[in-house]
């Protein structure tokens, strides 16, 4: 018999049950809280005090009055005395809530454990969340700002525990008979991912998983969506729910696993019968030799640009990528691409010059940039925009960004994040051109012969590779996710949140250095001023470029929001608590698609009025209202007497509702790296080009100097990815 069983979240059933019990008891039921423009339960989150002691990711809270003291009429007698436990997945792993109910029917003790949560964020929030459970006498707690996922996990786990205390545990699912693994049929489970609901539908026969369908269209494009695309095949291959999470997409992966487990339990499975992930025996690795014209290490923006252009030029190309998907740090780019004298600027009446682009970049980099590299990037930028047009990736929306004199940063028409947009387009071209991409394969060494690069050594889970090539292009990104390297060059950044993708660990820099490459500006590491600390999510510079402002915890502006990133970061760190709020309105939200991801992720706070917003973020309402009134007048006058802001003032902030995101600086870009010349050739410690070795993107140094201007990273990867490709093609033809 074919079963159709959809597992919905237990919460819905629990609320219905509590309502029924309360009605029978004659109790008054309050209307449930409604989410407004963000994840449920985050609208009025409490902020953890900066002076609060660090948590060991475990906390117990109990009321001051003796246990079993009387509780309010709203909760008295609702729950049965005893101790009850529930669990749910947080940001890093399982979170467990244990609640003790006294004889009077109220919660008398709350204990939360979550050893996998980020210590300074989710872990720090746990004591506050435990106290909130006691104060609320329910699972409907406000949560902690910046610890969205941990807060939601506590709500879900507490809901489970209180369900048990209410005597409303779910009916035990049927079990497969005999030595069968499943009851044949099709089953669906649901869970909450990074951007919304994730559904997993499985079709099973008595002893096998026959089909897996995953739906998670709201997950982050080219990060979570890769987990949605790839984990179904891995689950089918393993014939088990216990497969490794996709690196870099842990939240989405965990949501898929929760939904899958629900579906399999409904199918009669005993989950303890499946081996844990990674328990399969490892055999001896095989050895394989490959040959190609050009081998490219890294499938981020620079690597994919180089691969597409080299293939278009008639060369055979292999890309080696250590992650299970393409994109690298390019996926994280949310702003746009700087380019001067483009046809889009001309069509929109924007006056800009290559020379001004160069000067802005040099000034932003504190004049330690290599001017020759900057000049080439600026001169090539319009041509790069034309090439993006030709491959189906136009960037027609032109606006301001920090450090730019003119409207120069080019973005997708709908204002969506440029990185995910370009990665999707690059990937489509890679597939259409049939370029070989070796996923989950890590390059370990550059092979040389008589001083020239002649290929690479690499390895995957089960194979060692020798890849012979006429030319090698390094496009592995920087080292923003290698804390050891970060701390080595900048000890004061230890423990700082990073926006970098998981694979950005400096591999290419180390490989190049091993064959004699020189390094430049290696200690220049950039902080981005607008990073949501709980999720490491970067708030695109376009939000400020389109008119948003920054305020401190007093509700006051404190800087020109569109100064260079290092200047704005320094200004934030000087504020009480070393954080700020970015404030914007509905009109700005409507014009910038990237904001929808912030809303769906639950990191925004929304208020119907400025005063309402101020109360929710614990800022003085009168002060914030005065700040907005002044700012709107400055926009009308096109003059900012407080901080001399002259750009991003086309739109005021007067359209309700209003939004805020709590932000602080985070590691964003490593400006230093392998030294290259204007042909993207890698330079050795003696100042000579290493034959056959080229590099592009964040793996290189010299372009950005002491600070990278917003929009220049994408310009760098497309321009120098193109130049590296052209130079490698020419080298192959010698």
Predicted feature residues:
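Active-site- and interface-proximal helix/loop "cap" or "latch" segments in soluble metabolic
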Residues: 9, 31, 37, 73-281
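N-terminal Rossmann-like FAD-binding beta1-loop-alpha1 element of flavoenzymes
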Residues: 289-319, 729
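Core beta-strand elements of the Rossmann-like FAD/NAD(P) dinucleotide-binding domain
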Residues: 289-292, 460-471, 689
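Conserved N-terminal/central alpha/beta ligand/cofactor-binding core
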Residues: 325, 329-436, 440-442, 548-562, ...
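A glycine-rich dinucleotide-binding beta-alpha-beta segment and adjacent secondary-structure elements
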Residues: 445, 623-707
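Glycine-rich loop(s) and the adjacent beta-strand/alpha-helix scaffold that form part
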Residues: 460, 467-531, 723
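A conserved FAD-binding loop/helix module that cradles the flavin
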Residues: 484-510, 661, 700-732
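An anion/pyrophosphate-binding glycine-rich loop and adjacent beta-alpha core
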Residues: 509-513, 517-623
């Amino acid at each position: 018999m074919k079963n159709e069983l959809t597992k919905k979240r237990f919460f819905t059933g629990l609320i219905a049950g509590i309502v029924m019990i309360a009605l029978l008891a004659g109790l008054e039921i309050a209307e449930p809280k409604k989410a407004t423009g963000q994840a449920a339960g985050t609208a009025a989150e409490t902020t953890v005090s900066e002076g609060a002691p660090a948590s060991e990711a475990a906390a117990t809270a109990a009321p001051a009055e003796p246990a079993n003291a009387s509780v309010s009429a709203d909760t008295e007698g609702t729950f049965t005395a005893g101790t009850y436990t529930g669990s749910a997945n947080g940001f890093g792993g399982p979170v467990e809530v244990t609640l003790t109910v006294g004889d009077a029917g109220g919660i008398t003790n709350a204990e939360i454990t979550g050893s996998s949560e980020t210590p300074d964020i989710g872990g720090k929030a746990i004591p506050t969340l435990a106290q909130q459970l006691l104060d609320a006498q329910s699972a409907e707690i406000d949560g902690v700002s910046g610890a969205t996922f941990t807060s939601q996990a506590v709500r879900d786990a507490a809901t489970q525990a209180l369900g048990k205390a209410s005597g409303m545990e779910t009916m035990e699912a049927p079990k497969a008979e005999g030595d069968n693994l499943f009851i044949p049929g099709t089953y669906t489970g649901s869970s909450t991912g990074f951007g919304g609901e994730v559904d997993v539908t499985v079709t099973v026969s008595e002893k096998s998983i026959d089909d897996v369908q995953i739906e998670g269209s709201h997950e982050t494009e080219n990060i979570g969506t890769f987990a949605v695309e790839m984990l179904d095949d891995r689950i089918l291959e393993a014939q088990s729910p216990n497969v490794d999470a996709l690196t870099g997409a842990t939240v989405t992966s965990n949501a898929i696993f929760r939904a899958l487990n629900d579906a399999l339990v409904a199918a009669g499975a005993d989950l303890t019968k499946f081996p844990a992930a990674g328990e399969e025996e490892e055999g001896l690795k095989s050895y394989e030799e490959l040959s190609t014209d050009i081998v490219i290490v890294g499938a981020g923006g620079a690597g994919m640009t180089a691969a597409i252009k080299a293939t278009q030029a008639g060369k055979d190309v292999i890309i080696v990528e250590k992650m299970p998907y393409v994109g690298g740090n390019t996926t994280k780019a949310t702003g746009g691409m700087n380019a001067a004298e483009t046809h889009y600027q001309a069509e929109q009446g924007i006056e800009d010059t290559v020379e001004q682009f160069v000067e802005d970049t040099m000034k932003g980099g504190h004049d330690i940039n290599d001017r020759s590299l900057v000049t080439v990037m600026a001169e090539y930028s319009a041509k790069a925009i034309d090439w993006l047009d030709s491959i189906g990736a136009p960037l027609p929306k032109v606006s301001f960004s920090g450090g730019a004199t003119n409207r120069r940063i080019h973005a997708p028409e709908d204002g969506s994040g440029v990185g995910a947009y370009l990665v999707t387009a690059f990937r489509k071209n890679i597939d259409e051109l049939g370029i070989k991409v070796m996923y989950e394969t890590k390059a370990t060494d550059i092979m040389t012969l008589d001083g020239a690069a002649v290929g690479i050594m690499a390895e995957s889970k089960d194979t060692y590779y020798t890849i012979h090539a006429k030319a090698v292009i390094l496009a592995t990104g920087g080292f923003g996710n290698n804390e050891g390297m970060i701390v080595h060059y900048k000890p004061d950044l230890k423990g700082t949140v990073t926006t970098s993708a998981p694979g950005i660990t400096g591999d290419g820099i180390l490989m190049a250095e091993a064959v004699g490459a020189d390094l430049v500006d290696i200690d220049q590491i950039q902080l981005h001023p607008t990073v949501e600390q709980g999720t490491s999510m970067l708030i695109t510079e376009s939000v400020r470029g389109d008119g948003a402002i920054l305020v401190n915890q007093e509700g006051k502006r404190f800087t020109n929001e569109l100064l260079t990133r290092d200047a704005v970061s320094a200004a934030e760190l000087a504020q009480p608590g070393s954080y700020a709020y970015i404030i914007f309105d509905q009109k700005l939200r409507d014009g910038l698609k990237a904001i929808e991801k912030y809303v769906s992720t639950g990191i925004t706070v929304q208020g119907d009025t400025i005063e309402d917003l101020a109360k929710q973020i614990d800022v003085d309402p009168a002060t914030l209202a005065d700040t907005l009134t002044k700012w709107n007048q400055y926009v009308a006058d096109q003059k900012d007497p407080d901080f001399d802001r002259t750009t991003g003032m086309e739109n005021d902030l007067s359209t309700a509702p209003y939004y805020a995101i709590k932000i602080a600086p985070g590691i964003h870009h490593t400006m230093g790296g392998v030294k290259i010349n204007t042909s993207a050739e890698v330079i050795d410690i003696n100042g000579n080009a290493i034959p056959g070795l080229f590099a592009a993107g964040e793996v290189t140094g010299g372009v950005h100097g002491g600070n990278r201007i917003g929009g220049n990273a994408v310009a760098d990867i497309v321009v120098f990815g193109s130049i590296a490709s052209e130079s490698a093609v020419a080298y192959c033809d010698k």
